[in-house]
C-alpha cells in the first residue's frame, strides 16, 4: 500500500509540471492589465542610479523577484529542481521548492529537493510544507535543505478538487501558529493561485504571521490541474474560483488591511507586471510557471539571459516611474480601471487616493 501511495505522489508531481507548462500557453487574466502607472517625461534619475534592493523575509536581496514554489518529489523533477537552482544561483534570486511532503513520507525522494542546495550552496532557499505537516516534520523539511525560510502553502480549493486531497481544514490555523512560534527560520504563508483577501491576511497576522504571499489567480491554476487529472472532470464549475493577483493587491490598499509584509505572485508575465505589484506594496514578486515554461522551451542559459534582461528593464521602468528605489515606487500614482476598478470600489478601496499619490 505504501509503495502505491509513493508512486501516486510521484506521478502527481510529474503531472503537475506537465499540466502547468501546458497552462502557461493560455493563462487567465491577472487583473494587472487594469493597472496603469503614472510616469514622467522628465526623469529625475539615470538608469545607473536605480536601486532594486529589497527585503525578503528578513534578508536584504539585490533584486525584487524570486522563483516561487514549483516542484520536487520525482526523478524527473529532480532534474528540473537542479536547473531552477542553477538559474537562481546565476541570477542571484531566492528560490522556493515545491511541497516536500513526498520526501517526508519517502526518504528515497529527499535528493530530489536537496539537489537545490547542492547546486546553489549560498543562495536563499525556502522549504515548503502544508499545514497538514506537523512541526517535527516541518523542521525536518527545513533541515533537509538547510533552508533560510519556510513557506507554508494553503490550498483548500486545490485539495477539494484533488480526489486524494485533504478534507479537514479546521486545524490549519493553529498549526500555522505553532510554526510561527517554533520555526527556526522565518515563515511565509502562501496561497497557491487563488489569492488572499485582506480578511485572510488579517487572520494570519493575528496569530503572528509577518509575511504572506498573496499568490492570486492568473498564473498556474491548480483547480484546473487537479480537475484535469480526474477522469470525471467533475469540478469544471470551480475553475474560476479565487481572486486575481491584481484584486489581492488592491484589497491590501484598504485602510483596515493589516500592515504586514506581503509578496505577490500569480500570472507575472513581464517586468511591467513586477513593477505594478511592487508599486502596490509588494516587497518582492514570485514567478513559477513563467520560469519553468522558459526553462522547458529555451533551456537554462536562455532563461538566465531573459531574467538578466528583466533586471535592466526593471531599472528602466523605475526611471519612467520617477522612482529611485522600491520605497519611492510605492508612492508612485497609479490608475485602476476596468473590472478591477469596479471590484476595488465594491471592496471600498480609495482608488482616487492611489491615483494621486505624491
From Swiss-Prot:
Cellular component GO terms held in the UniProt record: cytoplasm
Annotated Gene3D superfamilies: Aldolase class I
Enzyme class: isomerase
Catalysed conversion reaction: isopentenyl diphosphate = dimethylallyl diphosphate
Keywords for the protein's UniProt record, in alphabetical order: Cytoplasm, Flavoprotein, FMN, Isomerase, Isoprene biosynthesis, Magnesium, Metal-binding, NADP
Residues annotated as binding FMN: 69-71, 99, 128, 190, 220, 267-269, 288-289
Record GO terms (molecular function): FMN binding; isopentenyl-diphosphate delta-isomerase activity; magnesium ion binding; NADPH binding; oxidoreductase activity
Enzyme Commission number(s): 5.3.3.2
Compartments, record wording: Cytoplasm
A GO biological process held by the record: isoprenoid biosynthetic process
SUPFAM superfamilies assigned: FMN-linked oxidoreductases (SSF51395)
Source superkingdom: Bacteria
Cofactor names: FMN; NADPH; Mg(2+)
Residues the entry annotates as binding Mg(2+): 159
Keyword Plastid: no
InterPro entries associated with the record: Aldolase_TIM, FMN-dep_DH, IPdP_isomerase
Main location: cytoplasm
Disulphide connectivity of cysteines: none
Residues that hold substrate according to the record: 12-13, 158
UniProt family annotation: Belongs to the IPP isomerase type 2 family.
Subunit note: Homooctamer. Dimer of tetramers.
Function: Involved in the biosynthesis of isoprenoids. Catalyzes the 1,3-allylic rearrangement of the homoallylic substrate isopentenyl (IPP) to its allylic isomer, dimethylallyl diphosphate (DMAPP).
Protein name: Isopentenyl-diphosphate delta-isomerase
Protein species of origin: Listeria innocua serovar 6a (strain ATCC BAA-680 / CLIP 11262)
Source organism phylogeny: Bacteria, Bacillati, Bacillota, Bacilli, Bacillales
Primary gene name: fni
Amino acid at each position: 500500500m505504501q509503495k502505491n501511495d509513493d508512486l501516486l505522489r510521484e506521478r502527481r508531481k510529474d503531472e503537475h509540471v506537465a499540466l502547468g507548462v501546458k497552462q502557461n500557453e493560455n493563462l487567465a487574466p491577472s487583473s494587472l492589465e487594469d493597472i496603469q502607472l503614472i510616469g514622467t517625461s522628465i526623469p529625475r534619475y539615470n538608469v545607473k542610479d536605480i536601486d532594486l534592493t529589497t527585503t525578503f523575509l528578513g534578508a536584504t536581496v539585490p533584486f525584487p523577484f524570486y522563483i516561487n514554489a514549483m516542484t520536487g518529489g520525482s526523478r524527473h523533477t529532480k532534474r528540473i529542481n537542479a536547473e531552477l537552482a542553477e538559474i537562481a544561483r546565476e541570477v542571484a534570486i531566492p528560490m522556493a521548492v515545491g511541497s516536500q511532503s513526498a520526501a517526508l513520507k519517502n526518504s528515497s525522494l529527499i535528493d530530489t529537493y536537496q539537489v537545490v542546495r547542492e547546486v546553489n550552496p549560498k543562495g536563499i532557499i525556502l522549504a515548503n510544507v502544508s499545514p497538514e505537516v506537523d512541526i517535527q516534520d516541518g523542521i525536518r523539511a527545513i533541515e533537509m535543505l538547510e533552508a533560510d525560510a519556510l513557506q507554508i502553502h494553503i490550498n483548500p480549493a486545490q485539495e477539494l478538487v484533488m480526489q486524494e486531497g485533504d478534507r479537514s481544514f479546521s486545524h490549519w490555523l493553529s498549526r500555522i501558529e505553532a510554526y510561527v512560534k517554533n520555526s527556526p527560520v522565518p515563515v511565509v504563508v502562501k496561497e497557491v493561485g487563488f489569492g488572499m483577501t485582506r480578511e485572510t491576511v488579517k487572520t494570519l497576522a493575528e496569530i503572528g504571521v509577518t509575511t504572506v504571499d498573496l499568490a492570486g489567480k492568473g498564473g498556474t491554476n491548480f483547480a484546473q490541474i487537479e480537475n484535469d487529472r480526474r477522469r470525471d472532470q467533475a469540478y469544471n464549475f470551480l475553475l474560476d474560483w479565487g481572486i486575481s493577483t491584481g484584486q489581492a493587491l488592491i484589497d491590501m490598499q484598504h485602510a483596515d488591511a493589516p500592515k504586514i509584509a506581503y509578496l505577490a505572485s500569480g500570472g507575472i508575465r513581464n517586468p511591467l507586471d513586477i513593477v505594478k505589484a511592487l508599486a502596490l506594496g509588494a516587497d518582492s514578486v514570485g514567478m513559477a510557471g513563467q520560469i519553468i515554461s522558459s526553462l522547458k522551451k529555451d533551456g537554462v542559459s536562455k532563461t538566465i539571459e531573459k531574467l538578466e534582461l528583466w533586471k535592466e528593464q526593471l531599472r528602466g521602468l523605475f526611471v519612467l516611474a520617477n522612482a529611485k528605489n522600491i520605497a519611492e515606487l510605492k508612492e508612485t500614482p497609479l490608475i485602476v480601471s476596468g473590472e478591477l476598478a469596479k471590484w476595488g470600489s465594491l471592496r471600498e478601496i480609495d482608488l482616487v487616493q492611489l491615483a494621486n499619490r505624491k
